[in-house]
């Protein structure tokens, strides 16, 4: 055990930021994780919980602020669990993310020369989210409030106007709150599993201006629906109003079923020239502006001239597949979630694209099977796996198929580095790497890498 005890005070300088956004400082070789700090801050902190070689501490006082420290724009930035980097100047956030990618590629990937292009940041890193799910609760004076969960808890921090979200959120939430008060609707209580009103889902198509509201309820129907619809329709752009029944004791927000109250049951949006239909339950990237840049980069790296056969592994609802299909002869998508593939096929039809075909299944099963049985071929393979990266069987099959180019889109640069190393040891050369900031003020960063067969 360390000699540190709870509530011990100490001084340290923040040198780095953890995966989850805490500042990292040291005292005589002991490592501290301290929330709400920025690289370069000299702080006084208080020990909360200690292990053998590291501990968690609470920031008590900033003794000397980092030159990159800024006043968070959002008044609840410190309590809310949503943003980790708001106190860091946006330029510095981008530098931090770029360095994270670079460090992982050198430390884990073993690369010495990294052909890195400047990270793609946002010109305006606020109000970029097209989707929000607001929980409802009571404050100490028994007022109805909504906002966001404080980090790692279910206590609600009141905030109707998150600065990452759209401006319409606030007006929509006011209408829903007024409706609850007017008709005495009860809030859902997680502990007793009683009460009706659960989360409110709000989505917007940034290119179309279309708005969607879906109210989640613990009950069969939403009382006084007509009055609610009438009020919500006063908001310009309101296109789809529905409710979702979720009677389970669960942290999952949406129920499986959606009942339509107004409109076609979906909204539409575009990424580039490709149109997407978004229903309350369908997956859609939350930052459409950066998604367009990210997929634009993937498309550029794919180097398509119109004659290529492309595989898009981990394709989700086919966003990248359809983007590529604009410039390829044929695109095959593979995704494990059947519902996502239904959406992908629907979106292909919506855009009149006939040169795409989708498979439901694991990439590491579908690809080897198609390769061994049907000798399928690829000029280019694009992968966009979840955080854990690609399965080795999948990488191995890619190597066997020997496409000229592999484009790797990643949301975790540590597993990216591991997988790139595997491919680089088997005939591929790392030709380009570029970060893209999809989630300003959070610690996350997306990366696109291009590998070329040598
Ligand atoms: N490119 C997609 C998003 C990819 S997110 C888009 O833009 O919509 C990663 C996707 O991989 C998720 O949809 C997830 O369901 C899927 N997935 C996870 N494990 C998988 C596996 N073993 N094989 C295929 N798909 C998988």
Language-model-detected regions and their locations in the chain:
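Terminal RNA-binding accessory module
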Residues: 1-72, 76, 357-358, 365
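Rossmann-like S-adenosyl-L-methionine
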Residues: 2-11, 19, 220, 224-235, ...
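Short, acidic/hydrophobic/Gly-rich beta-strand patch recurrent on exposed beta strands
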Residues: 23-28, 147-150, 214-216, 344
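Short, conserved phosphate/pyrophosphate- and ester-handling motifs at nucleotide-, phospho-/glycolipid
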Residues: 40, 165, 287
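Short beta-strand micro-motifs enriched in acidic
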Residues: 46-50, 135-139, 203-207, 454
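Conserved loop-to-beta-strand segment in the C-terminal subdomain of adenylate-forming
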Residues: 54, 208-212, 443
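Extended interfacial segments that mediate partner engagement and assembly in macromolecular machines
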Residues: 60-72, 78-187, 207, 222
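Flexible loop/N-cap segments at domain edges
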Residues: 200
């Amino acid at each position: 055990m360390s000699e540190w005890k709870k509530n011990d005070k100490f001084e340290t300088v923040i040198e780095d930021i953890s995966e989850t956004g805490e500042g990292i400082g040291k005292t005589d070789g002991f490592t501290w994780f301290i929330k709400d700090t920025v690289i370069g801050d000299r702080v006084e902190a208080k020990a909360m919980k200690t292990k053998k070689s590291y501990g968690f501490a609470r920031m008590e006082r900033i003794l000397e602020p980092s030159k990159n420290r800024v006043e968070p724009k959002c008044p609840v930035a410190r309590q809310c669990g949503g943003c980790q980097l708001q106190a860091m100047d946006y330029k510095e956030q981008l530098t931090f993310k770029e360095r994270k990618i670079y460090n992982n590629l050198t430390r884990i990937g073993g690369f010495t020369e990294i052909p890195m292009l400047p990270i793609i940041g946002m010109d305006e890193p606020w109000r970029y989210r097209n989707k929000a799910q607001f929980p409802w609760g009571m404050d100490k004076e028994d007022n109805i409030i909504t906002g966001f969960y404080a980090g790692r808890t279910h206590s609600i921090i009141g905030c109707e106007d998150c600065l990452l979200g759209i401006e319409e959120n606030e007006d929509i939430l006011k209408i829903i709150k007024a409706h609850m008060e007017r008709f005495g609707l009860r809030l859902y209580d997680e502990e007793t599993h009683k009460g009706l009103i659960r989360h409110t889902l709000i989505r917007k198509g940034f290119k179309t201006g279309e708005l969607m509201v879906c109210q989640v309820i613990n009950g069969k129907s939403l009382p006084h629906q007509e009055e609610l619809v009438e009020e919500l329709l006063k908001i310009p752009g309101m296109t789809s109003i529905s409710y979702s029944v979720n009677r389970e004791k669960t942290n999952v927000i949406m129920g499986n079923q959606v009942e339509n109250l107004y409109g076609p049951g979906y909204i539409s949006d575009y990424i580039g020239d490709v149109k997407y239909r978004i229903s309350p339950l369908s997956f859609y990237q939350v930052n459409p502006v950066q998604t367009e840049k990210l997929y634009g980069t993937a498309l550029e790296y794919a180097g398509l001239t119109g004659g290529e056969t492309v595989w898009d592994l981990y394709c989700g609802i086919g966003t990248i597949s359809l983007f590529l299909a604009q410039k390829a002869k044929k695109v095959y998508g593979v995704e494990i979630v059947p519902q996502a593939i239904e959406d992908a096929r629907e979106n292909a039809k919506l855009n009149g694209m006939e040169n795409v075909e989708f498979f439901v299944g694991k990439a590491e099963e579908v690809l080897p099977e198609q390769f061994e049985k049907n000798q399928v071929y690829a000029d280019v393979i694009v992968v966009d796996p979840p955080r854990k990266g690609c399965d080795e069987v999948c990488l191995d099959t890619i190597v066997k198929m020997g496409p000229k180019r592999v484009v790797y889109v990643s949301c975790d640069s540590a597993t990216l580095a591991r997988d790139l190393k595997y491919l680089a040891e088997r005939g591929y050369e790392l030709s380009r790497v570029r970060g893209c900031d999809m989630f300003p003020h959070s610690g996350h960063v997306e990366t696109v890498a291009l590998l070329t067969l040598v």
